């Protein structure tokens, strides 16, 4: 019992339960807890950019093999594209079989379209050239100041290559970045001590602001989406994991604390630093983890992909805006591009969805007002699926590139999650 009370897992679970209770008993007070959740997520986002930079630079400069770095990046992108496409198709397939919006006969004119317009205005269809140009930061500091993960990743790759080319003169800089990285991970450990407070505030706000009642009116869509995410995790990712020699069940058990943090905060970014440390502790090489995990937050959002296809077709069904098979394939193609711009932040999936429907024009954007009230509750499943998908991706790509210690992977997964006493060694 003493061991349980000293674990982060236990206290985050307690905090989530207390947040739910407060949101139900005193909704206005629960809604007022929002700053606690927002503050915790901002603390995490504060250290994401330097951790990604240090991890990637140390990984690239330490390998001495630039061809391997390029191969890792190429294989990661190939994996992301294939698995993201599978998740989009799975969402499209199940929403057409279950048809959660059929028979609702919603008149879009009766909905509050103004509530959706704010989201639609935030997103727009980017061309490939615009996307690539936006990956390049205006200045070295600008990428860190804005917290743009892809920009920081690009800087880190270039910096690591340049440092590796310096030869013997690189040692001083390498050692400095190594020590700085240790400080950043120690800072993450400090921030994680307040994770239960952040989870409590975020959950209390969600229940207090949106209410449990909003779940029942669209229960069929919610149930269909959650079941689809579970199917993806245990069937698709489970099959991928089994093929590559590890159990998805043991993997989920190993990262259970990170999953609870994501569940409580509804943001996959909240677990990014710890996920990078955990994947290294499972035997994946630092350079692989440093490339795959951050890139996955833009290119491998499996939960968001499932949500996008299901929500778009649900709105079409509910508003009687029939979509032909060809139009659904068009939707799929557009979402393959649009989903790459969805960051791992709460609400980003809804913004991308609104922008996609605006670009296609077949489904009324105002129909999204139907799911605006439950989007926050669906965000948890999106974020959890995203985190699990990126974790599996890092192990798979590490194995493909020969950068995985399979003995360590098997041993760590068998022994289960690290104890509180083992945490400092893993996080360093």
From Swiss-Prot:
Keyword tRNA-binding: no
Keyword vocabulary terms for this entry: Cell inner membrane, Cell membrane, Membrane, Symport, Transmembrane, Transmembrane helix, Transport
Transmembrane segments annotated in the record for this chain: 7-27, 40-60, 75-95, 143-163, 196-216, 221-241, 306-326, 329-349, 351-371
GO cellular component: plasma membrane
Main location class: membrane
Gene Ontology annotations of biological process type: L-aspartate transmembrane transport
Location relative to the cell: Cell inner membrane
UniProt keyword Acetylation, yes or no: no
Gene3D superfamilies on file: Sodium:dicarboxylate symporter
Pfam family, one: SDF
Gene Ontology molecular function, alphabetical: fumarate transmembrane transporter activity; malate:proton symporter activity; succinate transmembrane transporter activity
Membrane topology: Multi-pass membrane protein
InterPro entries the record matches: C4_dicarb_transport, Na-dicarboxylate_symporter, Na-dicarboxylate_symporter_CS, Na:dicarbo_symporter_sf
Similarity annotation: Belongs to the dicarboxylate/amino acid:cation symporter (DAACS) (TC 2.A.23) family.
NCBIfam families: PRK01663.1 (NF002461), PRK13027.1 (NF009587)
Function recorded in the entry: Responsible for the transport of dicarboxylates such as succinate, fumarate, and malate from the periplasm across the membrane.
Family matches, as HAMAP family: C4_dicarb_transport
UniProt name for this protein: C4-dicarboxylate transport protein
């Amino acid at each position: 019992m003493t061991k349980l009370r000293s674990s982060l897992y236990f206290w985050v679970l307690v905090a989530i339960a207390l947040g739910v209770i407060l949101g139900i008993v005193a909704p206005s007070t629960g809604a007022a807890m929002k700053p606690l959740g927002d503050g915790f997520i901002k603390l995490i986002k504060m250290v994401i950019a330097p951790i990604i930079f240090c991890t990637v630079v140390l990984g690239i400069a330490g390998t001495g093999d630039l061809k391997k770095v390029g191969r890792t990046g190429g294989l990661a992108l190939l994996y992301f594209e294939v698995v993201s496409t599978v998740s989009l198709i799975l969402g499209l397939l199940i929403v057409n079989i279950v048809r959660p919006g059929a028979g609702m006969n919603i008149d879009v004119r009766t909905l509050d379209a103004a509530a959706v317009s704010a989201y639609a205005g935030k997103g727009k269809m980017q061309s490939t050239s615009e996307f690539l140009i936006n990956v390049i930061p205006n200045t070295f500091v600008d990428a860190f100041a804005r917290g743009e993960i892809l920009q920081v990743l690009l800087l880190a790759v270039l910096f690591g290559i340049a440092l590796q080319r310096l030869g013997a003169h690189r040692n001083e800089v390498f050692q400095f970045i190594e020590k700085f990285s240790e400080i950043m991970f120690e800072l993450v450990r400090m921030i994680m001590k307040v994770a239960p407070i952040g989870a409590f505030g975020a959950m209390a706000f969600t229940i207090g602001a949106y209410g449990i009642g909003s779940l029942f009116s669209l229960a069929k869509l919610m149930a269909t989406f959650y079941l689809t995410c579970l199917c993806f995790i245990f069937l698709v990712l489970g099959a991928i994991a089994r093929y590559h020699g590890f159990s998805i069940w043991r993997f989920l058990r190993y990262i259970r604390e990170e999953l609870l943090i994501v569940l409580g905060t509804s943001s996959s970014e909240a677990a990014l630093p710890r996920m990078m440390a955990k994947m290294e502790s499972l035997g994946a090489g630092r350079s692989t983890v440093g490339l795959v995990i951050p890139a996955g937050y833009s290119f491998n959002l499996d939960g968001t992909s499932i949500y996008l296809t299901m929500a778009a077709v649900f709105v079409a069904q509910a508003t009687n805006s029939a979509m032909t098979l060809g139009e659904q394939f068009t939707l799929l193609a557009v979402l393959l591009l649009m989903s790459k711009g969805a960051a791992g932040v709460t609400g980003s999936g809804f913004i991308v969805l609104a922008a996609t429907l605006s670009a296609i024009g077949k489904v009324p954007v105002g129909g999204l007002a139907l799911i605006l009230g439950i989007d926050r509750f669906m965000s948890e499943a999106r974020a959890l699926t995203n985190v699990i998908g990126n974790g599996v991706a890092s192990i798979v790509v590490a194995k493909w590139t020969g950068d995985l210690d399979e003995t360590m992977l098997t041993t760590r997964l068998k022994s289960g999650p690290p104890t509180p006493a083992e945490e400092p060694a893993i996080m360093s």
